[in-house]
UniProtKB/Swiss-Prot annotation:
Alphabetized CDD domains for the sequence: GH31_MGAM_SI_GAA (cd06602), GH31_N (cd14752), Trefoil (cd00111)
Positions annotated as active site in the UniProt record: D518, E521
Positions bound to substrate: D404, R600, D616, H674
Protein known as: Lysosomal alpha-glucosidase
GO CC term (a single one): membrane
Catalytic activity field: Hydrolysis of terminal, non-reducing (1->4)-linked alpha-D-glucose residues with release of alpha-D-glucose
UniProt keyword Glycoprotein, yes or no: yes
Signal peptide: 1-27
Lineage, highest ranks first: Eukaryota, Metazoa, Chordata, Craniata, Vertebrata
Disulphide connectivity of cysteines: C82-C109, C92-C108, C103-C127, C533-C558, C647-C658
Amino acid sequence: MNIRKPLCSNSVVGACTLISLTTAVILGHLMLRELMLLPQDLHESSSGLWKTYRPHHQEGYKPGPLHIQEQTEQPKEAPTQCDVPPSSRFDCAPDKGISQEQCEARGCCYVPAGQVLKEPQIGQPWCFFPPSYPSYRLENLSSTESGYTATLTRTSPTFFPKDVLTLQLEVLMETDSRLHFKIKDPASKRYEVPLETPRVLSQAPSPLYSVEFSEEPFGVIVRRKLGGRVLLNTTVAPLFFADQFLQLSTSLPSQHITGLGEHLSPLMLSTDWARITLWNRDTPPSQGTNLYGSHPFYLALEDGGLAHGVFLLNSNAMDVILQPSPALTWRSTGGILDVYVFLGPEPKSVVQQYLDVVGYPFMPPYWGLGFHLCRWGYSSTAIVRQVVENMTRTHFPLDVQWNDLDYMDARRDFTFNQDSFADFPDMVRELHQDGRRYMMIVDPAISSAGPAGSYRPYDEGLRRGVFITNETGQPLIGKVWPGTTAFPDFTNPETLDWWQDMVSEFHAQVPFDGMWLDMNEPSNFVRGSQQGCPNNELENPPYVPGVVGGILQAATICASSHQFLSTHYNLHNLYGLTEAIASSRALVKTRGTRPFVISRSTFSGHGRYAGHWTGDVRSSWEHLAYSVPDILQFNLLGVPLVGADICGFIGDTSEELCVRWTQLGAFYPFMRNHNDLNSVPQEPYRFSETAQQAMRKAFALRYALLPYLYTLFHRAHVRGDTVARPLFLEFPEDPSTWSVDRQLLWGPALLITPVLEPGKTEVTGYFPKGTWYNMQMVSVDSLGTLPSPSSASSFRSAVQSKGQWLTLEAPLDTINVHLREGYIIPLQGPSLTTTESRKQPMALAVALTASGEADGELFWDDGESLAVLERGAYTLVTFSAKNNTIVNKLVRVTKEGAELQLREVTVLGVATAPTQVLSNGIPVSNFTYSPDNKSLAIPVSLLMGELFQISWS
């Protein structure tokens, strides 16, 4: 063995003294930088849902006062095995900057490394673990009906307080493609995430994986049986399990990693010493910061197009470190290590397997897929009515009108301004009469400012004990938009009933259709509370992840505050999810139809109850481009109903930016234009006629494609598919697709290539191998009531790709959308609302392969009823093309689907002009064939709910 002495042996002590002094200065600077407060942190700004509670600490535990003196670390011998490749060094000083002497006293190696860093990089560690660093030892391994159990023991404590020296390992081989293992304290109940997950009592019969264990140092090694590739190897660094610091590291089989949302980043994450922090935070998106949601799940692509995923079911504040070796380290501040490994083997299957655990997405109402419009500053019903009238007059679709805080009385939930919104209920009823819906903002914080008896939500909440409490048992009081506020505890069953009552009572006054949940990280304009926070170990843990503001209570409530299930320290990242669950439940019980909830804060499993918008994005080309990986990321995380504020929220947009953003936004699963009070208005009708024409064209295309989009949501709901998806999900064997995040697919069939830079009239995109047909060849304008301006420029009818980057014409009025060979998609005549568009005739676009084949399907129901699958109240029709013939198959037909009229079929890829076209055996005389585009347009008069056959020869 090649043994190296630690740096600064006696022979070079003089030089090393100088190095140590320099290092101390640098580390001091870095420590200040890590704890630096942002300006907004330095002042105040104007049911059976859960498993059994398991508290974080032992029964009866209360957090004690913080002892300010530094934790005494038992000095260890300086290591002699420090010849570790730089990319494989694991940080031995994650908690603070330390000197060489302190590092070596921990038994670790110290080698300075000069680097220039850019967020989210943290840099190569100077103090790192030697291979011989003590960890846990595996003992008493035994087989069980579902896997294995073992005891893990540590003989020497670490440098974190309250080590748990004896642990229990439970390994569950749950399915052939899912492995589940837990590491926890057998002697003390600790907090576990109360997420409803599958319980499996038997061992998988034919797993795709093998599991191995390293005895000392302890580790779990997971391999693919086919090929033997190591997917998980936790022996690469020591395991830590202290009361408030848990660390688990693993090697990675490749550097192609995605997931770990929510962050402003490319689709593929950097493994160049990147730190990803998960602690939900109200802050405008910027690189290297913790944002509104936490999803501790990653998907890794492997050579050959295989993929696997790993999910750490832990809701505590955490960092995830990615390093070049490649390797990943989880660092959590509490809970247990509850790990799922998904074997795929293809990326699509990994996502489905993850959703098998956290839940499949909810099925949105059809109207929710239309266009939504909002602005902070619609300050009266007169203004809202004028906006709606302007949208109609200028022929822009509008399905859902929204209001921000403006509608409220003193910015309090479940109230409305009796002056500027005096006829609020009438306004909402008028929207309904015109076939539209209405949504408004609801913040979780409840005003506590008024005298007793003046505000029912607070009075009732106090009486029923629904608020989060401080160390004295009284409601914790913070400050949000209405002034002083209390925060509902949505883990309390009583709170769910209280919230439902408040929603129902307000709905009886104002018949709104959905709820927009904002500020639910939860956000707080003071740190912790009006009275501050206790000085205890939950507020000042021994390890603080890289959160904005440097402390957990920054811009939120005290970590040590009390909730029904545990402390906020454990439950903070679940706050948005629990409010979404409560709101979805309240809407179902109040309205009796499918709920529609959009929430800013999210956690794993959120898509089961609600959608998401990406927060306070800026009106910039940079944020336009970042919205593509944002939307793709949330689809991989099981939240397909997602979108960014079209044209941007913060700052003034430009005409060109708003046109390009509207074109891309037409392909967000959730399409909303919304902006800030202090920014210029940006409704579509505000711009020049040229810009309006370009936007109308994008609107018309989206509304024409809604039947296909709705079918994709059905597949997401029943199968765990994505709606918007990255190219690698469909083409995993093509490595060129892996990092593509300036394009997106809708399902398997539509490829969208937006313009994301100013001043461009062409765009470059990657086209996987095959034929891609330009959707400009498919027109359904004549079927609807919404005219779509035709493009003034010529276009390329089809792309024949060998798997290559291609440059396409993209004038201002055009977003390139291509239909993939082998697919049939349903379309419908577009109108100003989905209420009207659902009444229009339908069409099929058929994209033939070289062998003349294609397939597709249509899912249809009434668009808003509950339990349509359970009641069989839906229509499902499949389509197939082969041998110059298109036929349908009726899987199930109900009244609504039976009445759908099919009026137009466009067949793409017809090599030669036909001489005869038949519809159910009857000749069609007025078909048209384009020899230039190789397209065949067939007018028909058929019903989707009846068998048909269309052929040409």
